[in-house]
């Protein structure tokens, strides 16, 4: 891993007004990116955003920086992250830029780049942009300055793309669906996609005001969706996060259906249709029930580190076409280049329509194991608790007791002095007791 100063695993992110998410930094970032990308030939960059109020300020700053470097900006307006990846490909733009902090609150924002083919920018290009940031900002000759324009049909183009991933011979006319768009970037996309495919749609979380993105709605908080599905006696609910790269579903009984279950349904349907190539990639946090259910179907399963970037890397390494995180990032490389909540949701709906089965019944082949997560704070600088003999001994005892019907995962938080203790097994009471036993051992260090 390179020692980049600004770019993390998912672009540049932070609180608006605090470095680096400030207008002056973002202007210079636009200029530096423009200088680097202009070397590659194309003169246009796609810029999309979610519905945060700060998006207006940041897209203006980016556009000014790009123009100073001689590149033109094409604005999409509020648009899901995967839509920007798609439009970057179809417009043959040199790059796409998304202004979003995904599932974070409105006061955060971030900048993420896509390359010309709709995938993440290569590390070398990000490093070149950072190197350019160290230079004094300059301006091309007036005649060479970049321009700005809007892609007026951006939403329509992406809606048609999404619909094209749903089989022509199927219809959603039998389904009543509640869709929750998190007051985010899918608010004008997802309801229209579902309606045009025939569904009876009830939309919530579709009234963005700049500050209500992800606020008690969307994929990170499905309580409002669960309540509405039950109240409307709907067949199911679908929730997206603020930038539309995650999807979580709710069955007609109000049960949450997470990314693990969604991947199970899509992988099993792919197998039935003879379209599954290779296996499926999850993460260290993927439920053991997923692994066992896929094993019963004869589908290979591999675990990547937590993070959709690492899931994609493992998929590419294996040559597999499907991967997911339990948080709802689902990557289907036969359809898209990045996690796409709408496209993933449509594949589940296709399985429902083709098999005339409810979402609840499609999930029935996979038994979710209870997963207990305990966060333990430790004193930074006092050594690594995970290396302590007492912690290792208790962990070994628990692993021996669980055998091959459970798992223990201990990992450090990347952002604060926390040890995350996760224990998974068939018996919830036993798993809870084991998790707290390990947590107590960590605290005692």
From Swiss-Prot:
Gene Ontology molecular function terms on file: identical protein binding; magnesium ion binding; phosphoglucosamine mutase activity; phosphomannomutase activity
Modifications after synthesis and translation: Activated by phosphorylation. Can autophosphorylate in vitro using ATP, alpha-D-glucosamine 1,6-bisphosphate or alpha-D-glucose 1,6-bisphosphate.
Cofactor(s) needed by this chain: Mg(2+)
CDD domains, per database record: GlmM (cd05802)
Reactions catalysed: alpha-D-glucosamine 1-phosphate = D-glucosamine 6-phosphate
One Pfam family matching this protein: PGM_PMM_I
GO CC terms: cytosol
Modified residues (Phosphoserine): 102
Protein family per UniProt: Belongs to the phosphohexose mutase family.
Annotated protein name in UniProt: Phosphoglucosamine mutase
Native source species: Escherichia coli (strain K12)
Organism placement in taxonomy: Bacteria, Pseudomonadati, Pseudomonadota, Gammaproteobacteria, Enterobacterales
């Amino acid at each position: 891993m390179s020692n980049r100063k600004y770019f993390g695993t998912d672009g540049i992110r932070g609180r608006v007004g605090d470095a680096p998410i400030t207008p002056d930094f973002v202007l210079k970032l636009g200029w530096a990116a423009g200088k680097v990308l202009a070397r590659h030939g194309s003169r246009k960059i796609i810029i999309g955003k979610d519905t945060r109020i700060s998006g207006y300020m940041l897209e203006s700053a980016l556009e000014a920086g790009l123009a100073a470097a001689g590149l033109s900006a094409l604005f999409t307006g509020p648009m899901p992250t995967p839509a920007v990846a798609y439009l970057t490909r179809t417009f043959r733009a040199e790059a796409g830029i998304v202004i979003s902090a995904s599932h974070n609150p409105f006061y955060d924002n971030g900048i993420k780049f896509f390359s010309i083919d709709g995938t993440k920018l290569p590390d070398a290009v990000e490093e070149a942009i950072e190197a350019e940031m160290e230079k004094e900002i300059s301006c091309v000759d007036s005649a060479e300055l970049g321009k700005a324009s809007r892609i007026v049909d951006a939403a329509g183009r992406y809606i048609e793309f999404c619909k094209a991933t749903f089989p022509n011979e199927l219809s959603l006319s039998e389904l009543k669906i509640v869709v929750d768009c998190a007051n985010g970037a899918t608010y004008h996309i997802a309801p229209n996609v579902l309606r045009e495919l025939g569904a009876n749609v009830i939309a919530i979380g579709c009234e963005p005001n700049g500050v209500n993105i992800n606020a008690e709605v969307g994929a990170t908080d499905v309580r409002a969706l669960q309540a509405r599905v039950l109240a409307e006696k709907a067949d199911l609910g679908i929730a997206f996060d603020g930038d539309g790269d995650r999807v979580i579903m709710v069955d007609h009984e109000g049960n949450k259906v997470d990314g693990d279950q969604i991947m199970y349904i899509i992988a099993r349907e792919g197998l039935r249709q003879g379209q599954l190539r290779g296996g499926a990639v999850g993460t260290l946090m993927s439920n053991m029930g997923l692994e066992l259910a896929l094993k019963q179907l004869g589908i290979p399963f591999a675990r990547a580190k937590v993070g959709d970037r690492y899931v994609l890397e493992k998929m590419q390494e294996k040559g597999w076409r499907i991967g997911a995180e339990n948080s709802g990032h689902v990557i289907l490389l036969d359809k898209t280049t990045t996690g796409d909540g709408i496209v993933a949701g449509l594949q589940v709906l296709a399985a429902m329509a083709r098999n005339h089965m409810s979402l609840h019944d499609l999930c029935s082949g996979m038994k979710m194991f209870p997963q207990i997560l305990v966060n333990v704070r430790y004193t930074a600088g006092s050594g690594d608790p995970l290396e302590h003999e007492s912690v290792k001994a208790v962990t070994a005892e628990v692993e021996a007791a669980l055998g091959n019907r459970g798992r223990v995962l201990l990992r450090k938080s990347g952002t604060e002095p926390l040890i995350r203790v996760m224990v998974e097994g068939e018996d919830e009471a036993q798993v809870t007791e084991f998790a707290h036993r390990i947590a107590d051992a960590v605290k005692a260090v």
